[in-house]
C-alpha cells in the first residue's frame, strides 16, 4: 500500500468507514516527497527517539520508522486506531499512544519510552493547536530539536525580526527557547482534503539555556504579552495596562532605565531589550 497515493488512501479510509474531521484539522499527505523530506529534516537515525503527534494514516510515521531507533506516535482520534493498525503493522519500532498529547508528562514519556535515545519531535501538526503544542515541546526540557510542518504564516512569525508585522509574543517565546529555521514550503495540493493555506516545515533547535539572562522569566513573558496585546499603544501605556502592579510612572522609569525612547512601541524590542526591561520593571516593582 502506498500511503501517499490518493486511490490507496481513499480505499483505506473506505474500508474503515473513516470521514475527515474539520475540528481536528485532519489533512493527509498525498505527495511522497513531503514525508520523506520531513523525516530527513528531523535528523532521525538509529540513535534517535522520535515523538510524533497526529500521525493521520501513518505516512510520516512510516518514514520516521525507517530512520529512527524508535517512534512514539500520539493520536487523539480513536477512529484512526484500526487504520493505523493496518498501515503500520510492519513497523516494529513504532508505539502508538491514543490520547491528547497536551495531557501527557513529556519528560516521563521520553524517559520511559526512549531510554538512551536522543529525543526529538517530528510531526505534521494540526493547525488549530500549533501554539499550545509548540509551548509544550519547548518547555518540556527534554527534546533536542522540534521539526514540524505548520501553517506558513505561523512559521514566519516564529522566525520574525523586531519591527516587522510578523513579530509578536509567539516569536519572542519561541526564540527565547529555540533557534528556528524555515526549511521548505508544502503547497495545498499535496494534501487531501486540500487546506486553504500553504504549509511550511520549520526546525527548532532547542536551546540549552536562554540567549540572555533574566531575573524573572515569568515577569518577562508577562511584559512581552502586555507589549503585544496593545501593539498600537506606546510601551509605557501597554505595560501600565497589562502588567499587574505597574502604573505609568513605574513603566516610564523602567523604559528610561533601559535607555529607550518614551514613545517606543513593544514590537520594536529585541529579546535582550525585553529581558532588560523586565529586570528594570522588577527592580521598580521591588
Model-predicted regions and their roles:
Residues 240-245:
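Short helix-coil junctions and helix-kink-helix linkers
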Residues 1-226, 256, 267, 276-286:
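Catalytic cores of RNA-modifying enzymes
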Residues 253-262:
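Short helix/strand-capping connector loops at secondary-structure junctions
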Residues 248-251:
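Short amphipathic alpha-helix in the helical subdomain of ABC transporter nucleotide-binding domains
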Amino acid at each position: 500500500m502506498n500511503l501517499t497515493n490518493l486511490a490507496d488512501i481513499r480505499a483505506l479510509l473506505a474500508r474503515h468507514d473513516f470521514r475527515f474531521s474539520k475540528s481536528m484539522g485532519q489533512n493527509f499527505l498525498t505527495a511522497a516527497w513531503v514525508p520523506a523530506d520531513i523525516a530527513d529534516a528531523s535528523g532521525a537515525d538509529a540513535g534517535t527517539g522520535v515523538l510524533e503527534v497526529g500521525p493521520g494514516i501513518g505516512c510520516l510515521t512510516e518514514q520516521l520508522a525507517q530512520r529512527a531507533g524508535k517512534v512514539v506516535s500520539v493520536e487523539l482520534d480513536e477512529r484512526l486506531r484500526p487504520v493505523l493498525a493496518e498501515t503500520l503493522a510492519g513497523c516494529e519500532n513504532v508505539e502508538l499512544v491514543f490520547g491528547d498529547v497536551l495531557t501527557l508528562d513529556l519528560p516521563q514519556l521520553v524517559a520511559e519510552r526512549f531510554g538512551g535515545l536522543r529525543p526529538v519531535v517530528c510531526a505534521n501538526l494540526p493547525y488549530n493547536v500549533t501554539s499550545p503544542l509548540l509551548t509544550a515541546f519547548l518547555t518540556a526540557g527534554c527534546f533536542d530539536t522540534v521539526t514540524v510542518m505548520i501553517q506558513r504564516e505561523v512559521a514566519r512569525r516564529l522566525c520574525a525580526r523586531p519591527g516587522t508585522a510578523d513579530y509578536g509574543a509567539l516569536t519572542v517565546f519561541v526564540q527565547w527557547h529555540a533557534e528556528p529555521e524555515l526549511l521548505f514550503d508544502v503547497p495545498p495540493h499535496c494534501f487531501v482534503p486540500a487546506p486553504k493555506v500553504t504549509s511550511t516545515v520549520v526546525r527548532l533547535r532547542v536551546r540549552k539555556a536562554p540567549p540572555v539572562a533574566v531575573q524573572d522569566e515569568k515577569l518577562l513573558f508577562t511584559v512581552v504579552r502586555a507589549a503585544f496585546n496593545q501593539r498600537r499603544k506606546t510601551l509605557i501605556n501597554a505595560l501600565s495596562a497589562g502588567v499587574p502592579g505597574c502604573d505609568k510612572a513605574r513603566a516610564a522609569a523602567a523604559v528610561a532605565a533601559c535607555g529607550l525612547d518614551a514613545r517606543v512601541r513593544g514590537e520594536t524590542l529585541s529579546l535582550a531589550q525585553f529581558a532588560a526591561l523586565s529586570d528594570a520593571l522588577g527592580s521598580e516593582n521591588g
